[in-house]
């Protein structure tokens, strides 16, 4: 009888030990990212998963006109949802983007002005993106959501300006730790109704592996610089904006899932706004931009 009880205890002990070994093996079998291993990076989560993001965009402008400071800060707070749609293209994704919420305001020495965003909250539009993010397009440009802030506060703002931050261009070939790739693209800068064109040259470097919000990510650090050019005729005068911009970003790409989890960008620019006409003017201008984007549940 004693031998039988001892035998049962031994069987239980062995079973527990085997269970522990299985658990340890299972936990250890989840392959972690290796900084020295090559990974092929592609945007692909949108095929099977909705992704929601919170983005905060801040733009500070410092300028002086006829001896009077005209400083302003514009703040945009977004929540938007990416949903995959059926696409005939194997190398691109068709996404529906829903603007779930947006708060927009401008702060000056005279106080704070909030912009009416009710007409675009909850609205959607489509976007096509290539697997590497090198091409972004809009099948129905007339669907794009615009926020009219008035000529002096920033003009009509097309919301595609924030989306590029979600899709930095990925390298065509697999990358491993320390490797660099480059990207060139255009976007508009917010400054009154001028909204000058920014021609950006960016350099991306894979610098580390890191877990962010539960995802195993490649950490990428980027630097970029740009020439800024814009012109417009207003009130019988021709206005031009010429300047330079430089900035840096940190972004985290979930390799297995195929999407950017988090982005943080800082930029500074300097330029000159000139006008022609009976009373020509030359106004120096400086701007600081910060962008923070992260996925939310």
Give, region by region, the residue ranges found by the protein language model.
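Bacterial N-terminal signal peptides that target proteins for export
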Residues: 3-16
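Signature of exported/secreted
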Residues: 27-297
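Bacterial N-terminal signal peptides
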Residues: 15-23
């Amino acid at each position: 009888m004693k031998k039988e009880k001892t035998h049962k205890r031994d069987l239980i002990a062995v079973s527990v030990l085997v269970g522990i070994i299985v658990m340890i093996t299972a936990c250890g079998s989840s392959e972690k990212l290796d900084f020295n291993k090559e990974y092929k990076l592609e945007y692909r989560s949108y095929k099977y998963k909705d992704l929601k993001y919170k983005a905060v965009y801040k733009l500070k402008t410092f300028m002086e006109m006829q001896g009077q400071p005209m400083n302003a800060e514009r703040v945009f707070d977004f929540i938007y949802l990416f949903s995959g749609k059926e696409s005939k293209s194997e190398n691109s994704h068709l996404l529906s983007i829903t603007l779930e919420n947006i708060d927009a305001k401008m702060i000056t020495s005279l106080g704070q002005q909030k912009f009416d965003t009710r007409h675009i909250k909850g609205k959607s539009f489509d976007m096509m993106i290539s697997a590497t993010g090198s091409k972004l397009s809009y099948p129905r440009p007339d669907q794009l959501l615009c926020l009219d802030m008035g000529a002096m506060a920033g003009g009509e703002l097309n919301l595609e300006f924030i989306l590029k931050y979600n899709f930095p261009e990925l390298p065509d070939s697999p990358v491993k730790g320390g490797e660099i790739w480059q990207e060139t693209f255009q976007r508009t800068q917010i400054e009154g109704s001028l909204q000058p064109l920014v021609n950006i040259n960016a350099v991306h470097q894979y610098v580390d592996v890191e877990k962010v919000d539960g995802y195993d990510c490649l950490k990428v650090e980027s630097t970029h610089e740009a020439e800024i050019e814009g012109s417009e005729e207003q009130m019988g005068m021709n206005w031009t904006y010429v300047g330079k911009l430089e900035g840096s970003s940190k972004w985290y790409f979930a390799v297995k899932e195929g999407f950017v989890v988090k982005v943080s960008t800082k930029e500074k620019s300097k330029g000159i706004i000139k006008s022609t006409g009976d009373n020509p003017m030359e106004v120096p201008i400086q701007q600081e931009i910060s962008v923070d984007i992260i996925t939310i549940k």
